Design a protein with these regions (language model features):
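Signal peptide processing junction and immediate N-terminal pro/mature segment
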Residues: 20-26
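Active-site HxH/HxHxD metal-binding segment of metal-dependent hydrolases
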Residues: 33-40, 49, 56, 127-131, ...
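Conserved beta-strand hairpin/beta-sheet module of binuclear metal-dependent hydrolase folds
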Residues: 84-140, 231-252
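Metallo-beta-lactamase
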Residues: 87-88, 93-95, 131, 142, ...
Length: 341
């Protein structure tokens, strides 16, 4: 490392610290520090029981997934906002026909077929579709004019925000369940106030398929996170070797007791569906749910012979779904319930 390079690096680090001081260096007192979320009515014994079950299922290889879903996400919102921020991520070919083309906070996946592209989720807005998805498709060698379908996994703005732009610009068909079409068509709130949804197009039912260019994506309605969250099973290959990917459309938990109970039931059903389909690849619609951005970096810097980090294997995928279920049961226990059936 040259002296000039060290000087440049040091100057950059000092500039970063000056622009964004760490909380401990900001001069603010402890009274201003954000607390972890508290659950005063929780059933502590049930929380402990389901946390223990989730941790056992996680083993050592799925600890990041366990930590995020069971602990970090519900307990430490400040960390969630720091990690799950809007940011640019290098688009990456993950499987022979599957590409990550989203951003740091939320995923978008392009499934390439001989007759066009199926896009899974459309980020937050028309701006992100135009300035992130479209350039990312081009960077990995895909022509956005070949977009044929946009599958919206659930009716939150960060997943359908760019769908209308892609519908209007490229004529892509937009796919969602009936409950989540209705959800998208209601006026948005908070950061999604004023967001214009896509025109209602393809309404799918549980068990339907979207087929394009010989590739079929099976769709299942898995309520919980939203009333009509869609979960997907589809084939991929890694250097020509066949695998099966599974994307649970709403792993972020429910909003109240009833929706979390729905989530638990959906995850149990998803376990059966993905076991029967021999799913061995997890795909998520937020990178944080499986440390996906870290895995993308491993792929970009892979050496010959390195394993694809998205290949979990069937047994590990079953444990992954089991962790999600137990973490939903933890959520119920934090509401004061047992978390049991």
């Amino acid at each position: 490392m040259t002296t000039a390079f060290r000087a440049t690096l040091a100057a950059g680090a000092l500039a970063w610290l000056a622009a964004a001081p760490l909380p401990a260096q900001s001069g603010a007192g402890p009274a201003s520090y954000p607390p972890q979320t508290r659950f005063p009515g929780e059933n502590a014994a049930a929380v402990a029981r389901h946390l223990s079950a989730a941790r056992r299922l996680a083993g050592s290889d799925l600890l990041p997934e366990f930590y995020w879903r069971c602990l970090t996400s519900p307990l430490d919102k400040a960390t969630v906002f720091q990690i799950q921020h809007n940011g640019l991520v290098e688009p990456t070919r993950v499987f022979d026909q599957l590409y990550s083309v989203g951003q740091n906070a939320v995923s978008a996946w392009a499934l390439d077929t001989r007759d066009g592209i199926i896009l899974i989720d459309a980020l937050n807005s028309a701006d992100e579709a135009r300035d992130i998805i479209v350039p990312n498709l081009k960077k990995v060698g895909l022509d956005p004019a070949r977009l044929r379908y946009v599958i919206v996994t659930h009716g939150h703005g960060d997943h359908y925000g760019g769908a209308k732009y892609l519908q209007d610009t490229y004529g892509a068909r937009v796919v969602a369940s009936a409950p989540d079409w209705a959800m998208m068509e209601r006026p948005g709130r908070g950061p999604f106030a004023g967001l214009v949804p896509p025109r209602r197009d393809v309404v799918v039912k549980d068990g339907d398929q979207v087929t394009l260019g010989g590739t079929s994506v099976r769709l299942y309605v898995t309520p919980g996170h939203t009333p009509g969250a869609l979960s997907l099973i589809f084939p991929v290959t890694d250097k020509g070797v066949a695998h099966v990917a599974g994307l649970m459309g709403g792993t972020g938990g429910g909003q109240d007791s009833a929706s979390v109970h729905q989530q638990v039931a959906s995850l149990r059903r998803w376990q059966a569906l993905t076991t029967a389909a021999k799913v061995d690849v997890p795909i998520t619609n937020h990178p944080t749910h499986m440390a996906a951005n870290e895995k993308l970096a491993l792929i970009r810097y892979a050496r010959p012979g390195d394993a694809n980090p998205f290949l979990y294997g069937q047994a590990a995928y079953r444990r992954f779904v089991g962790v999600q279920e137990q973490c939903s049961r933890v959520q119920l226990a934090r509401m004061g319930e047992t978390g049991d059936d």
